[in-house]
Amino acid sequence: MEKMVMKMLVIFVFGMNHWTCTGFPVYDYDPASLKEALSASVAKVNSQSLSPYLFRAFRSSIKRVNALDEDSLTMDLEFRIQETTCRRESEADPATCDFQRGYHVPVAVCRSTVRMSAERVQDVWVRCHWSSSSGSSSSEEMFFGDILGSSTSRNSHLLGLTPDRSRGEPLYERSREMRRNFPLGNRRYSNPWPRARVNPGFE
């Protein structure tokens, strides 16, 4: 009987060590921190958006939590955003704004990494790409430069997204497809990419 108890204790201790070494989530973070991290991610998008409207997140999920020390961590989040009816100058909380409605209102899929210390946001990095009916792919992925443009000007500016230069050719083909689906209303902006400005300090 004693041998059986000792054997069970050894298995239990070994199993706990194994989970810790393989990244078993042992950090007990406050759910309020997750909400703050998501709000900071959306705020980062809205702060650099070209759109006159605020974006709001939905279908959010946490992908990973990395404990840096006993008081700091990073969170990897995935969420979707869509324009709301609230204008930027209103300074409203996007979470309280209604989504815009209509067939041509796009949805972007975003991933963010948020570094927190003492339960406060320190740094935020965000990367998004527009969703499509066929699903996302590497050729559709775009990185934030001047970020998201308004849905009212999406025809001429491809929503303000700046392409990843390493995938320039696939993105050019994608832009031609989007222009076929959403014909340009103003031919003066038929080639928006040379006008795009890249913000090197933001990913």
UniProtKB/Swiss-Prot annotation:
Compartments, as annotated in UniProt: Secreted
Keyword Membrane recorded: no
Keyword Secreted: yes
Entry GO terms, CC: extracellular region
PTM annotation (Phosphoserine): residues: 90, 138-139, 166, 175
Region annotation (Disordered) ranges: 155-174
A GO biological process held by the record: bone remodeling
Signal peptide positions (record): 1-23
Amino acid composition bias (Basic and acidic residues), ranges on this chain: 164-174
Posttranslational modification: Multiply phosphorylated at serine residues. Phosphorylation sites are present in the extracellular medium.
Family: Belongs to the SPP2 family.
Name this polypeptide is given: Secreted phosphoprotein 24
